[in-house]
Amino acid sequence: MENFITLNPIKKINGTIYLPGSKSISNRALLLAAQSVGATRLINLLDSDDTRYMLAALLQLGVKYKLSTDHKICEIKGVGGSLQSKNTQTTLFLGNAGTAIRPLIAALSIKSHNIVLTGDMRMKERPIFHLVDTLRQGGGRIEYIERDHHLPVKLYGGYCGGNIVIKGDISSQFLSAVLMMTPLASKNTYIEVIGSLVSKPYIDITLSVMRAFGICVQHDKDYKFFYCEGNRIYKAPQEYVIEGDASSASYFLAAAAIKGGTIRVLGVGKNSKQGDIKFANILERMGSIITWGDNYIECSKGIMLKSIDIDVNDIPDAAMTLAVIALFTTNNLPMILRNIYNWRVKESDRLHAMATELRKVGAIVSEGYDYLHIVPPVQIQSAFINTYNDHRIAMCFALVALSNVSVTINNPKCVCKTFPDFFDRFLSVGNNL
């Protein structure tokens, strides 16, 4: 793939898409399978940069696994307890894979000594203070190597559980990371969440995967308090099927909502554990026609595609797709996306990046501390889109090609983080004739 890709105007949209495995579920399942008693066969594993970083780290930690030729099935033999480095000078490099590095920091804070975890330049910019502080409360000995509150870090073990307080308003990945290692701690763990919990559906994913591996966490209905017994062990479920990625589904469902025709995505459905399936409900509220099945969601264009004012804190990834859909709304009202501060601590500062790139194609955008106010253009303009090495920016701006102008996307290879063949799949449901 070249350093850019130009998508010419797409005239029609129609087809069926088999979704790649969920990134969030894939890396959670890999980590828990690695720490389980017994062997697990993971089916529909996502093959992407993020999962490859996790697999490489597990290999360095002595975990044995076997991948199918297409990397979508992984047979992994658990170590039956906490992960620990076999080498006192181990360094794990995890790129910009937040779903790998944060859970691994937590998992390795129990027993590992003198192990360093680091990432690429963007990952080093993403603060991890709240996770490190939480682990230190439980006895974890963690040292910042280059600058406070950021990667790289060196771990010296020591985490044992107990009473923990964690902020919930920065990233749900911090809470997920701590939750996944609570049963392996020597003490029972009581967690209190301070502030509003962002991206709550991702905590539901964590709890669901933990249940599949034999561990149930108690919590109140508001997700303010969690309790898990220590000195327990994960048990391999023998086989675990990973859902399709609901965030990735958003681009294809949006395409049908914008252009017409019908798109069916397979791999997620009405019983999905992923919060981003709520994206389909939002499309329906905006005027699209949605049909649900046990393992599919189908979208067709409605009479009008309406802008709305909505809190999208629960679906931060799919909400980016809504920002681009705003370009195509026809009810003469702005699209307002609220409660999205955590966009700023993702693979890029997504709030600023999205505002910048939307303006290039003609939208009038107001960027607030935690919101975007988007007025669609009278005529969408052709533009060269910077992706900031952010896979989701690249994928959602592909939707601009559903207008009557082309769009050129810089660094399309960044989609390898979660959806390596995205552009091929996207063009497969389009027709330029």
Curated annotation (Swiss-Prot):
It is found in: Cytoplasm. Phosphoenolpyruvate binds at residues 23, 98, 126, 173, 350, 392, 417. GO terms for biological process: amino acid biosynthetic process; aromatic amino acid family biosynthetic process; chorismate biosynthetic process. Pfam families: EPSP_synthase. One of its GO terms (cellular component) is cytoplasm. It catalyses: 3-phosphoshikimate + phosphoenolpyruvate = 5-O-(1-carboxyvinyl)-3-phosphoshikimate + phosphate. Its main location: cytoplasm. Keywords: Amino-acid biosynthesis, Aromatic amino acid biosynthesis, Cytoplasm, Transferase. It is an enzyme of class 2 (transferase). The keyword Transferase applies. Pathway: Metabolic intermediate biosynthesis; chorismate biosynthesis; chorismate from D-erythrose 4-phosphate and phosphoenolpyruvate: step 6/7. 3-phosphoshikimate binds at residues 23-24, 28, 171-173, 199, 317, 342, 346. The active site is at residue 317. GO terms for molecular function: 3-phosphoshikimate 1-carboxyvinyltransferase activity. Its EC number is 2.5.1.19. Catalyzes the transfer of the enolpyruvyl moiety of phosphoenolpyruvate (PEP) to the 5-hydroxyl of shikimate-3-phosphate (S3P) to produce enolpyruvyl shikimate-3-phosphate and inorganic phosphate. Monomer. Belongs to the EPSP synthase family. This is 3-phosphoshikimate 1-carboxyvinyltransferase. It comes from Blochmanniella floridana. The lineage of its organism: Bacteria, Pseudomonadati, Pseudomonadota, Gammaproteobacteria, Enterobacterales.
